UniProtKB/Swiss-Prot annotation:
Pfam families on file: Virul_fac_BrkB
InterPro entries recorded: UPF0761_bac, Virul_fac_BrkB
Main location: membrane
NCBIfam families: PRK01637.1, yihY_not_rbn
Transmembrane regions: 43-63, 100-120, 139-159, 179-199, 209-229, 243-263
Bilayer disposition of the protein: Multi-pass membrane protein
Subcellular localization(s) per the UniProt record: Cell inner membrane
HAMAP family, A to Z: UPF0761 (MF_00672)
Keywords on record: Cell inner membrane, Cell membrane, Membrane, Transmembrane, Transmembrane helix
GO cellular component entries: plasma membrane
Family: Belongs to the UPF0761 family.
Protein name: UPF0761 membrane protein Ping_3482
Amino acid sequence: MKFGRKIVMDKVKVTYQYLLFVWRRSEQDNIKVPAGHLAYVTLLSIVPLLAVIFYMLAAFPVFSDLKGMLEDLIYNNLLPTSGDTIQEHISGFIENTKKMSMMGIGSLIAIALLLISTIDQTINRIWRCTNKRSRIQSFTIYWTILSLGPVIIGASLALSSYLFSVFQEHGSLSFGQRLLSLMPFILTWLTFAGVYTLVPHQRVSFRYALIGGLIAAILFFFGTDLFRLYITNFPSQQIIYGALAVIPILFVWIYYSWLIVLIGAEVTATLEEFLKQQEDNNVTKEYLGADI
């Protein structure tokens, strides 16, 4: 009984030490500053990025029926309480981009690539990566993300629709609905894990990326509910800013979202380092015990 209690207390102690380790590392990296930078760049590039995504999907007729579903997914997660308002404004902006010249479209792509580049630099700063990719290699990777990302999103939505139809045909609609209700969380989790695995310029254990991605996904969806509750019960922003309230609210939400992404990155980056330190400490204790 005492042995089992000791194991539990040791695990609690290690967990506390790790949380303290992550906190200190986050303070050292001052992640609030890059989160604000990413939020600002996101506001600048959100219309170009969505325009590029929808252009890419339009190139594949198989995804044409999924455009509405994708829009709902993006706008509902973009701001939990004002999805319809944001969708109306951004859709109008995207429609305006169709009137642009080739030079204008090129500038849209450049702004979208700027966001991806900023994400890449911020994540690698957390990992303390010293080796850098060449400009050509970086551009190739950014362009691949920009071109294949919408296709992967479209394929995921198509798979969700297919699974729903299969469950419906076999009379397992309630199970299918429960499964599909988890799809946004699962996709968010895997997206975070994919970012933490692929973006750093070094090898990252996918197991640690899954842990960091899970924590980020939980915080993201918890924050979504909390944010919705706050906006619904304390509508001070709407009273002060009126119709313009969506702008500061959108910025705060994007800032929070990037803060969560960076917290998940800190968790993933520090897991291996912390466990290595614990292992070294245990080896040292065993050595000292044997020496005594």
